[in-house]
Amino acid sequence: MGRGIAFQLTNILRDLGEDLDSDRCYLPLAEFRAMELTPEMVRAWSEPDRCAEFIRAQCERARAHYDRSAPLDAMIDATCLPTLWAMTEIYKGVLAKIEADPQLAVRGRARLSTLRKVWIALRAKHALAKAENPK
């Protein structure tokens, strides 16, 4: 369940600006209030230091779910593990971009380059081939 929560939090952060523009907010309002912010203030980035701190705190929460879900990898069938690994690498990569530039959560859409995604896919495909044909 932790990996799913981590993926969902990453999606929420990736789409935050777009969602706020459409009057949707999937983060708890109590977390905004705890930092004396509103979703509108974060969207406008009106308090840059607090907004960045808020986004980083959400990133830390997502990262904690990724970390706590690490034991999941040992429970997954070897032929399914490369897919989970690839998804996790892509989502963690998006999260890392937001962590490095918190305003990206409202300024644009964090994404990995096509080259990075191709590299991840090739590594997953290689791992799948090894899992399907163990020596």
Give short role names for the model-derived ranges.
Residues 1-7, 13, 17-135:
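Catalytic cores of Mg2+-dependent Asp-rich isoprenoid enzymes
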